[in-house]
Curated annotation (Swiss-Prot):
UniProt domain Globin: residue ranges: 1-141
Binding-site residues, heme b: 58, 87
One GO process term, biological-process aspect: hydrogen peroxide catabolic process
Gene: HBAD
Protein name: Hemoglobin subunit alpha-D
Species this protein is from: Sphenodon punctatus (Tuatara)
Subunit structure: There are three forms of hemoglobin in Sphenodon: A, A' and D. Hb A is a tetramer of two alpha-A and two beta-1, Hb A' is a tetramer of two alpha-a and two beta-2, Hb D is a tetramer of two alpha-D and two beta-2.
GO MF annotation, one: oxygen carrier activity
Protein family according to the UniProt entry: Belongs to the globin family.
Pfam families: Globin
Lineage: Eukaryota, Metazoa, Chordata, Craniata, Vertebrata
CDD domains noted in UniProt: Hb-alpha-like
Length: 141
């Protein structure tokens, strides 16, 4: 469960993500494809090469959706219900992949936020991304 302190840390550090959504998102996706190559199966129509426009665009969408979740932490489920439906019913993404991408996004944050990615910030993002993954997986039940 996200505490008030967690929410404050997320909102403060998210300010540093703004303006870098496409870069951070693309980097997280590329890390996921390298580390967990089985995830590529969900993107058969994408050019999966480094710097691909499709990866950059999708990365931006992912990080922008996370930004909306940061803004709407109190009612994340209702704010992101459409995404949950899309991933469960249309794309049929195995929910374990949400955790894989979350791990890669946390690495990207650590690399770019450097000293500002403290253990408390790491804990807050871990809890937040887990909550987002749980919300996306709601429709699978």
């Amino acid at each position: 469960v996200l505490t008030h302190e967690d929410c404050e840390l997320l909102q403060q550090t998210w300010e540093k993500v703004l303006g870098h959504q496409e870069d951070f998102g693309a980097e997280a996706l590329e890390r996921m494809f390298i580390t967990y190559p089985q995830t590529k199966t969900y993107f058969p129509h994408f050019d999966l090469h480094h710097g691909s426009e499709q990866i950059r665009n999708h990365g931006r969408k992912v990080v922008n959706a996370l930004g909306e979740a940061v803004k709407n932490m109190d009612h994340m489920s209702t704010a992101s219900g459409e995404l949950s439906n899309l991933h469960a019913y249309n794309l049929r993404v195995d929910p374990v992949n949400f955790k894989l991408l979350s791990e890669c996004f946390e690495v990207v944050l650590a690399v770019h936020l450097k000293d500002q990615y403290t253990p408390d910030v790491h804990r807050a993002y871990d809890k937040f991304l887990s909550a987002v993954g749980d919300m996306l997986a709601e429709k699978y039940r």
